[in-house]
A protein has these predicted regions:
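Non-catalytic accessory regions of SAM-dependent methyltransferases
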Residues: 1-131, 138-141
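Glycine-rich nucleotide cofactor-binding entry segment
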Residues: 131-229
């Protein structure tokens, strides 16, 4: 498979399983990455980021779509709703993907999924959002940070507005994975070298000599150091 419609079709299926069927995002995504482990790292990273970002920003994405669509998100077909969500996420948050490519691939995917009659609708909504994305204004912090208002209100009441907003921002930052090294199998330096050889970003922590923070990897099971214990 090549990056483009094939990767986006994988993303669409993953998000349908998560957002429409209630699947746990880390489990569904992990299973998909394991199934498609023959894809190159760039494609898997594209899949991971788009899936995770779309799930995290669903509340905000729905607000944007509703602002530029004649049909509200809740009334859309699941495939179209999901296709728009993942595409709008790319338009708003993935600068390396040209908006024109996002729109074109979404139209192709709508057609491939037998929604030929809605190609114009998908194209119109996405291009309208693309043209106006710099003028987007958020009505409140719930939409701005894509956090349910009841949670945000509870945190503000408990911790104060400034701390609550800081907590929400922290949730939206790219996450790192903490792993404990099995120093009976290899030295910490050997484990770090193995990880770096697979182009994983590795950070040490002063909190524990046996713990490493990992980022910019596909999934743990794909790492040699993880597979070797």
């Amino acid at each position: 498979m090549t990056n483009g419609n094939s990767s986006r079709e994988i993303i669409l299926d993953i998000l349908l399983e998560i957002l429409e069927k209630g699947g746990y995002s880390h489990i569904v995504l992990g299973q998909a990455l394991s199934k498609y482990q023959y894809l190159d790292k760039q494609e898997r990273a594209f899949i991971s980021r788009t899936v995770e970002g779309t799930v995290e920003y669903t509340l905000q994405l729905d607000y944007v779509i509703n602002s530029y669509s004649s049909v509200k998100v809740k009334k859309m077909k699941p495939v179209i709703r999901t296709l728009l969500r993942m595409s709008v996420y790319q338009i708003l948050y993935m600068d390396r993907v040209p908006d024109s490519a996002v729109c074109n691939e979404a139209v192709k995917l709508a057609q491939k999924r037998k929604f030929t009659g809605l190609k114009g609708f998908v194209n119109g909504v996405l291009r309208n959002i693309s043209r106006n994305k710099e003028q987007l204004k958020w009505p409140d912090d719930s939409v701005r940070y894509s956090m349910p208002s009841w949670i945000l209100d509870m945190w503000k009441g408990t911790y104060g507005e400034e701390t609550a907003v800081s907590m929400v921002k922290a949730f939206l930052k790219p996450s790192r994975t903490a792993v404990r090294c099995n120093l009976n199998r290899a030295s910490k330096q050997e484990i770090m070298e193995s990880l770096k050889n697979q182009v994983v970003t590795v950070e040490e922590t002063p909190l524990s000599a046996a713990v490493l923070y990992l980022s910019k990897y596909d999934y743990l099971e794909s790492l040699d150091a993880f597979a070797e214990g």
